[in-house]
C-alpha cells in the first residue's frame, strides 16, 4: 500500500533505519526467484570452450534419465490438473484423509468444458462449514489456515503463497480475478505450486477517503471468498493494528505465521519445506515504488528481494519499461512476475463507490453477497470523495 497514506508519513531518508525493522533475512525461506534464469544470467560465457569428456558424461546421464521416465502414452489434459486446496477444518486432519487417492480423483473432476477445478469453486449460496470468522479485536485474532494446502501435490514444485494488501473498499471481481490470473501464470511459467491465497485489508489508520470501517471491509472480503473460492482466505491482522503497517512488515507477519510458527508446508516425502510468500499488486503499486521519497529503499529490497512481487498490468500500462528504468526493481527483476491481462478488467473500487452514491447499479461488478452486505449496512451512500481522487484512482 502507498506509504504516503500513513498518518505519520515522512519522506524516507537515505540509509534511514525504519522502525520496526524488517525481519532478518535468515528467517525467510530461500526458494529462489520466481522467474527462471536464462543463459545471459549465468557467469560463464555461452561460447566458451568446453570439456568433451564432461559433455559426453552429461549427455549420457540425460539420455538415461529420459529413457527411465519415458511415457507409453500422451496423458489427457484433465490428468494434468492437480487440486490446489481442500477446505479442511483444522491443521490436525489425518494424513490418510488429506492424501487419499479417491479424494484426490474426486477433486480433479472437471466442471463441464471449463478449465476450472471443483476444488477452486465454493458453493455460490451456502457459506462453507467450519469457516472461522476473523476477529474484530487483536486479542481474539487467529491466523486463518482452513484453506491452506497441508501437503504439496507435485514433488517437483516448491510451495508459494500469494498475499494481496489493499483497502478493498469494497472488494470487486477484479480483486478476485487478480488471484486467478496469478495462479494461471504461476502454474504455467514457474516451478512453484500455489498452496493458498490471502487478502490483507489495511487498518483504519490508512488515510484515504472512502474507506469503510475495517471490520466491514474484512467481512466483505470474507463473503466474497466464502461464496466464490475454496483456496482464498482473509487475514485481519493488518486491519487490527493500531497504526499503519508497512507492506514489508505485513509480509513478515505471513512468514512468521506460516514458516516460523508452522514450519512451512509438508512435502510429498513427509518433510516440512519453507513457503515462498509473494505480494500480489496492480501496476499502479509498482509505479508508486518508483516514485522518489515514497518507499524506503530498505523496504523495497526486503519486499522484492526476500519475498517477490506478482504484478497485474492495467490497461495502457507498460510495467516492463518501468522495471528497466528503476535500479532497485531491475536488480530484483527475477523475483517479479508480470501478469498480462488477456481480458482487460479495470473495475475500480473508487468508481463502484461513486456508482453507489449516485444510486446506479453495481450488479456484476461485485459478488452478490457483497452487494447485499453494502445494502444492509448502508455503506458508501453518504460519503464524499475529492473529484481528483475519483478521476485519478486506479484502485
Curated annotation (Swiss-Prot):
Signal peptide: none
Keyword Amino-acid biosynthesis: no
Entry-annotated residues carrying Phosphoserine: 85, 89-90
UniProt GO MF annotations: ATP binding; nicotinamide-nucleotide adenylyltransferase activity; nicotinate-nucleotide adenylyltransferase activity
Residue segments, region Disordered: 1-34, 62-102
GO biological process: NAD biosynthetic process
Catalytic reactions of this protein: beta-nicotinamide D-ribonucleotide + ATP + H(+) = diphosphate + NAD(+); nicotinate beta-D-ribonucleotide + ATP + H(+) = deamido-NAD(+) + diphosphate
Record's function text: Catalyzes the formation of NAD(+) from nicotinamide mononucleotide (NMN) and ATP. Can also use the deamidated form; nicotinic acid mononucleotide (NaMN) as substrate to form deamido-NAD(+) (NaAD). Key enzyme in both de novo and salvage pathways for NAD(+) biosynthesis. Predominantly acts in the salvage pathways via NMN.
UniProt-recorded name of the protein: Nicotinamide/nicotinic acid mononucleotide adenylyltransferase 2
Gene: NMA2
Amino acid at each position: 500500500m502507498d506509504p504516503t497514506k500513513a498518518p505519520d508519513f515522512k519522506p524516507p531518508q537515505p540509509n534511514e533505519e525504519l522502525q520496526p525493522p524488517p525481519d532478518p533475512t535468515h528467517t525467510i525461506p530461500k526458494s529462489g526467484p520466481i522467474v527462471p534464469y536464462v543463459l545471459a544470467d549465468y557467469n560463464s560465457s555461452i561460447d566458451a570452450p568446453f570439456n568433451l569428456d564432461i559433455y559426453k558424461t552429461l549427455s549420457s546421464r540425460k539420455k538415461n534419465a529420459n529413457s527411465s521416465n519415458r511415457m507409453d502414452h500422451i496423458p489427457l489434459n484433465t490428468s494434468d490438473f492437480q487440486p490446489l486446496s481442500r477446505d479442511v477444518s483444522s491443521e490436525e486432519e489425518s494424513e490418510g484423509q488429506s492424501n487419499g487417492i479417491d479424494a484426490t480423483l474426486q477433486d480433479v473432476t472437471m466442471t463441464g468444458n471449463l478449465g476450472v477445478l471443483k476444488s477452486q469453486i465454493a458453493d455460490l449460496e451456502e457459506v462453507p462449514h467450519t469457516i472461522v470468522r476473523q476477529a474484530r479485536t487483536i486479542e481474539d485474532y487467529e491466523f486463518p489456515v482452513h484453506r491452506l494446502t497441508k501437503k504439496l501435490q507435485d514433488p517437483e514444485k516448491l510451495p508459494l503463497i500469494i498475499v494481496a494488501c489493499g483497502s478493498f473498499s469494497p472488494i470487486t471481481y477484479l480483486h478476485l480475478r487478480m488471484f486467478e490470473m496469478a495462479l494461471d501464470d504461476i502454474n504455467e511459467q514457474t516451478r512453484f505450486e500455489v498452496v493458498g491465497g490471502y487478502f490483507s485489508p489495511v487498518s483504519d489508520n490508512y488515510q484515504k477517503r472512502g474507506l469503510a470501517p475495517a471490520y466491514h471491509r474484512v467481512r466483505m472480503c470474507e463473503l466474497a471468498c466464502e461464496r466464490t473460492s475454496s483456496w482464498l482466505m482473509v487475514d485481519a491482522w493488518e486491519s487490527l493494528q493500531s497504526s499503519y503497517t508497512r507492506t514489508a512488515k505485513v509480509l513478515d507477519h505471513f512468514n512468521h505465521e506460516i514458516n516460523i510458527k508452522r514450519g512451512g508446508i509438508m512435502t510429498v516425502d513427509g518433510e516440512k519445506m519453507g513457503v515462498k510468500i509473494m505480494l500480489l499488486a496492480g501496476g499502479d503499486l509498482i509505479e508508486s515504488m518508483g516514485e522518489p521519497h515514497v518507499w524506503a529503499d530498505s523496504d523495497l529490497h526486503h519486499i522484492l528481494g526476500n519475498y517477490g512481487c506478482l504484478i497485474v498490468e492495467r490497461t495502457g500500462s507498460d510495467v516492463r519499461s518501468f522495471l528497466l528504468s528503476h535500479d532497485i526493481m531491475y536488480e530484483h527483476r527475477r523475483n517479479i512476475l508480470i501478469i498480462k491481462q488477456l481480458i482487460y478488467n479495470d473495475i475500480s473500487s473508487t468508481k463502484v463507490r461513486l456508482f453507489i452514491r449516485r444510486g446506479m447499479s453495481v450488479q456484476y461488478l461485485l459478488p452478490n453477497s457483497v452487494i447485499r452486505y453494502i445494502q444492509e449496512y448502508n455503506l458508501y451512500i453518504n460519503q464524499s470523495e475529492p473529484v481528483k481522487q475519483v478521476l485519478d484512482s486506479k484502485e
